[in-house]
UniProtKB/Swiss-Prot annotation:
Located on the platform of the 30S subunit, it bridges several disparate RNA helices of the 16S rRNA. Forms part of the Shine-Dalgarno cleft in the 70S ribosome. InterPro entries: Ribosomal_uS11 (IPR001971), Ribosomal_uS11_bac-type (IPR019981), Ribosomal_uS11_CS (IPR018102), Ribosomal_uS11_sf (IPR036967). Residues 15-25 have a biased composition (Basic residues). SUPFAM superfamilies: Translational machinery components. Residues 1-25 are annotated as: Disordered. This is Small ribosomal subunit protein uS11. Part of the 30S ribosomal subunit. Interacts with proteins S7 and S18. Binds to IF-3. Belongs to the universal ribosomal protein uS11 family. PANTHER family: 40S RIBOSOMAL PROTEIN S14/30S RIBOSOMAL PROTEIN S11. GO terms for biological process: translation. The keyword Transcription regulation does not apply. Keywords: Ribonucleoprotein, Ribosomal protein, RNA-binding, rRNA-binding.
């Protein structure tokens, strides 16, 4: 009995949320390539997120997330989701120095998105924070 009342207060049965289909012919693709992962975000021209994917959300774990193939799969997944909303052309903005940055751009083009421009927006410090120490293996 208590379970029924608590469910009614929440609004009844939970319905699966349906993603509404937008019509966005041109947008932006942000590729954030770190040494551990690659995140691909596709937005409309105003910056509102249409679709996103990452190597981790594409099923890769651990050191496999940092491979170019994982970045390719992540970019394909994000492109497929964005093309469902009508996206055809993208301006690509790349940030970071990870292994997957080149492969992610190629995957966006191979998925059917027309790459209009590629801009590197990697932040470069003017001698700010001290970088991490070098790895010794």
């Amino acid at each position: 009995m208590a379970d029924r009342r608590r469910g009614a207060a929440r609004g009844g049965a939970a319905r699966p949320r349906r993603r509404e289909r937008k019509n966005i012919p041109r947008g932006r693709a942000y590729i954030h390539a770190t040494f551990n992962n690659t995140i691909v975000t596709l937005t409309d021209p105003n910056g509102n997120v249409v679709a996103w994917s990452s190597a981790g959300s594409s099923g890769f774990k651990g050191t496999r997330k940092s491979t170019p193939y994982a970045a390719q799969v992540a970019a394909e997944n994000a492109a497929r989701k964005a093309m469902e909303h009508g996206m055809r052309q993208v301006d690509v903005y790349v940030k970071g120095a990870g292994a997957g940055r080149e492969m992610a751009i190629r995957a966006l083009a191979a998925a059917g998105l027309q790459v209009m421009s590629i801009t590197d927006i990697t932040p470069v410090p003017h001698n700010g924070c001290r970088p991490p120490k070098r790895r010794r293996t």
